């Protein structure tokens, strides 16, 4: 029988978009097993505790990205996870497409740059860290030909800072 609610899964099953999976440390290996079993692409969203699974995330062809955060809010009951800023550098170094998220309604979108700054403080190159806010998310969505870079013909919203915002928070 026809079920309209199932239509949302068609682009995922046809590999046109990844399935966005809310996941923490305790869920990540299960997400990878499901992605492999059903041959679907995924992004792991939130991903606190990802430093425990760098090799697995980097080697799985179904992982289209890891979107980390937010880091400045409390966890829900039962979701005791480690906040591992170094995970983003480790994943980036391993070739995983990484991005940063805030859950803006809970933590505020202004925290995005501060969170990227924490990655820089943990050793990530500032330019690579800024890519987590620009081209990397565009690649996860398959939109890198339209957004994510300042280049002729691309769509962009531009913010000008007087210093590197992930290095100088008051920029």
Regions found by a protein language model. Name each.
Residues 64, 69-72, 78-163, 169-170:
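His/Asp/Glu-enriched, well-ordered alpha-helical/loop segment
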Residues 2-84, 99, 139-141, 162, ...:
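Active-site core of metal-dependent hydrolases
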